[in-house]
Amino acid sequence: MIYNESLPDNLPSLCSKALLADVPCDRLVRDLRPDFFYRPASLERMCTSGCAAALSSWTSSVRSACGKNVSVPTDFDLLASPVVIPATLEHTFEFTCLRENNKFCGPVAALAAVFTDPGVSPFNYLSEAPEGTTDPGRCDSCIAARLRMRAGSPYFDGPIVASESLYQRLTSSCGITGKPVTTTTIDYSISEPEPTEDSCDGTQYTIQNTDDCYSISKAQGVATAWLLADNGLAAYCADFPTSGSLCIANKCDTVTVGVNQTCIAIANSAGITVTQLKAWNQVINPVCSNIGMMNGTTLCISPPGPRLPLPGTTDIPPLVPTTAAPVPTDAAAGSNKPCSRWYNVEAGDYCNLVILKFAISLDDFLFLNPGINANCTNLYAKESYCVHPVGDINTYAGRPGHVSITIDPNATFTGIPFTMLPNATVKGYSRPYTPAPLAKGVREDCVHYFKGDDYQFPPDQLGYWKSNCELAARNYGADNDNFVAWNALGTNVTDPSCSFVPGGRYCGSWNSQVVRTITETEPATATTGDGGPTPPAPTHSGQPQDCDTWHVVSSGDSCQSVADDAGISRDQFHDWNPAVGRDCSTNFWLGQAYCVGVSEDMGDMSTVASSTTSSVTPGPSKPEPPGPTHTGQPSDCDEWDVVETGDTCGSLAESNDISLSQFFDWNPAVSRDCVANFWIGQAYCIGVSS
């Protein structure tokens, strides 16, 4: 199963021999993976009782031969008993060959995966459900058995499955009883890494009787979070020691956080940016929503850590000489320009050799020594030539950078003083139209915007999509979570109640993304008759006579992508195009027209619902909340505020002149620490009529 070169050299010979023993199993067993679905034929071939017995015997012999005092390195620098090697493979074999009701469970899980997430997967031999099969469902005995085995295993993702009680939740919801989890453990070695001596890069401080976490951080000039992190202490000063010493390493200029202070207020008062504040205090989360839990602690308002010393002076001469060298008595004729270095030519020298020796170009060498001809045939031995200019050679007379200016200090200035010049003016660009205002909470820096009026389709016209929000997100190719955040929707895009307010603009893409149109433009060649538009390209037989929407296949299309683009299901596509094989491998051709809508099912998809107006009789009424709300808010609430990025419970109460207690009384769903149910885009009550 394993090779000699893969084992450590320091293993005892008996242990190595046991590990290298032959195990009579199919060759597929050696490379088994727990995250792979194997075909039934492969399972029949390798899942034999003989192989199971051989693996069990191999594990037992390795445990006996290697003992408890031998270890091999594993992940995360842990040392484990060598028995982990055969035991891991034995577990993978048992998981792969798991059976329920005399059937392999792997193919059942593969079929369930196809129904849950259809498409080609590198871990799945199925790309779509075979015809005539049904979804096994999450309560299938095989699905439960596989989850039960994972929950009791110490290998792979077993500890995660156990910690999240996934199997217990499944058995509870599916009514499965009498099948508890059986837990196994890994044979880890008792040897542990040698502890490293703690070192402090700063100064040691001895804790006094009157000290606490907050007083030490203030007195020592260190942020509270840095003090805790540098000493391996619990967050929020929990279980802070009352004796011993502390390492004070990351000193900085500090400020104490006040009640209900915000990141913006702290940064402004310190003369720094919010970005700097978060960079120097990594305990602050990206949106500063946890600053309200830090009152009384100290934060850094300058870079933490030791200051680098200022650079000192150096005696190294400048790279470019700034003073001329004395002119030698044997200087060549014409070599009379300022020169920082001279070279006395020796017999056998020639121009190319000299310029290579002193890293100077031939043009510069001839410029500094004009007595040499263009062919460089009159370079004389025993004479000195200039091989380096003083400063930049381009500032010499006759070079491109040379400027000669003569200034008369007694001349009278005749121009217009700079202070008397008129201020520059810029004429703004006039837009040919006035864009609609941004809807409440929508980002102001998006690349593409759209009007809420464009997505007011009734449910029967949405087709595949669950809401107008999901339709817009798909048209702009946006991730669901990002789309919700850009537009402060307050609910998932797949929620049928998710919608846009007419008259406002919404963010379609924050970065450059390809915008897909809502409806396809009909080809110019299509004509309308009694049976619907004439197909714009050749068609197959069997397509419905009342088809009124067509799609011509282009490069990159698939049955699924055509159905998705048209807002129909895959089954509808195949029902309306029966010539196409269910796996899309036959009769799906480039340039061919396929039916994606019929008159009795689709309706007029090109019609965009226009905003309607209705008259309302004036009368006393309370204001409608400007965003989604929580339960428990008072019925007589007449003032609302929608949470934006950077808001806290304290800042919301302060900006609306109410107390924090009033805020929590009127919004009982929000936890008192402002952690639970305080959401961006949600409306909260900040005033009542009574």
Swiss-Prot record:
Q: Which Pfam families match?
A: LysM
Where does this protein have coiled-coil stretches?
A: none
InterPro entries given in the database record: LysM1-like, LysM_dom, LysM_dom_sf
Q: Which sites does the entry annotate for glycosylation?
A: 4, 69, 260, 295, 375, 410, 423, 492
**Residues in domain LysM?**
203-248, 253-301, 341-387, 549-596, 639-686
> Which superkingdom heads the taxonomic lineage of this protein's source?
Eukaryota
- Locate the region Disordered: 523-546, 606-636
After gene disruption, what is the outcome? Does not affect virulence on Arabidopsis, N.benthamiana and tomato.
What PROSITE patterns would the database entry show? LYSM (PS51782)
Record bears the keyword Ion transport: no
Keywords on record:
Chitin-binding, Glycoprotein, Repeat, Virulence
Q: Where is the composition biased (Low complexity)?
A: 606-619
Spell out the molecular function terms from Gene Ontology.
chitin binding
Family membership noted in the UniProt record: Belongs to the secreted LysM effector family.
Q: What does this protein do?
A: Might have a role in sequestration of chitin oligosaccharides (breakdown products of fungal cell walls that are released during invasion and act as triggers of host immunity) to dampen host defense. Does not play an important role during host colonization.
Q: What else is known?
A: In plants, chitin acts as a microbe-associated molecular pattern (MAMP) that is recognized by lysin motif (LysM)-containing plant cell surface-localized pattern recognition receptors (PRRs) that activate a plethora of downstream immune responses.
Q: What is known of its domains?
A: The LysM (lysin motif) domains are small globular domains involved in binding chitin in eukaryotes. Vd5LysM contains 5 LysM domains.
Q: What is this protein called?
A: Secreted LysM effector Vd5LysM
Which organism's genome codes for this protein?
Verticillium dahliae (strain VdLs.17 / ATCC MYA-4575 / FGSC 10137) (Verticillium wilt)
